[in-house]
């Protein structure tokens, strides 16, 4: 029976992945800031605490979804937190996974790691431009380092770059916009031809599991 370790299982996408895994024949362990009494949990705050090697014991596949995405209240501290959580902790986890003999490491990154679309066209896997913000830059840096770890080991590294994720209980700007529309805050706007790529959270978690 396969054993999976999930980081970020309390988040929007991670909680749906956990629900999907509950319906499969597998063993599940979690890496979280707070204990989950329903699962074997290693309590660890990524970017602040050292990750225990024991968290990777007997794990076949790691689903790494945890990351730092927003902090509008403390801009002076943002850069350091992004680096420590999105890059340093990701690399630390992957290196421990290699030590523990983990076979697959699945990193849920972001479409922002690929930078903006080139010449207004849809992006593909081979399109790469410079990420605009610190979030995209740190996700890209983590991707590069993970691929290098994968090349130097027997652990297979997969990277998924989701576009904007929507679905029940979604957080972030999309949810704020939809709430504003429902409350009548947004007047009707003329057609301007803007398009935005999106993916439903359940489609995303099925894709994540398919990669495993």
Regions found by a protein language model. Name each.
Residues 178-186, 196-212:
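Alpha-helical substrate-binding/gating segment
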Residues 3-24:
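N-terminal Rossmann NAD(P)H-binding glycine-rich loop of SDR-like oxidoreductase domains
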């Amino acid at each position: 029976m396969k054993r999976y370790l999930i980081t970020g299982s309390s988040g929007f996408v991670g909680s749906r992945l956990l629900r999907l895994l509950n319906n499969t024949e597998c063993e599940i362990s979690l890496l979280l800031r707070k204990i989950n009494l329903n699962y074997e949990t290693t309590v660890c705050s990524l970017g602040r605490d050292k990750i225990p090697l024991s968290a990777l014991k007997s794990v076949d596949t790691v689903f790494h979804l945890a990351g730092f995405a927003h902090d509008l209240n403390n801009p002076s501290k943002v850069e350091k937190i992004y680096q420590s959580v999105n890059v340093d902790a990701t690399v630390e986890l992957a290196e421990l996974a290699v030590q523990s003999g983990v076979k697959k490491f699945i990193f849920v990154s972001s479409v922002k790691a690929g930078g903006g679309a080139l010449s207004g066209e849809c992006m593909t896997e081979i399109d790469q431009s410079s990420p605009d913000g610190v979030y995209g830059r740190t996700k890209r840096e983590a991707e590069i380092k993970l691929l290098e770890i994968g090349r130097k080991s027997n652990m297979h590294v997969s990277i998924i770059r989701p576009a904007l994720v929507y679905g029940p209980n979604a957080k972030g700007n999309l949810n704020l916009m939809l709430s504003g529309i429902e409350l009548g805050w947004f007047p009707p706007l003329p057609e301007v031809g803007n398009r935005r790529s999106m993916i439903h959270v359940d489609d995303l978690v099925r894709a994540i599991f398919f990669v495993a």
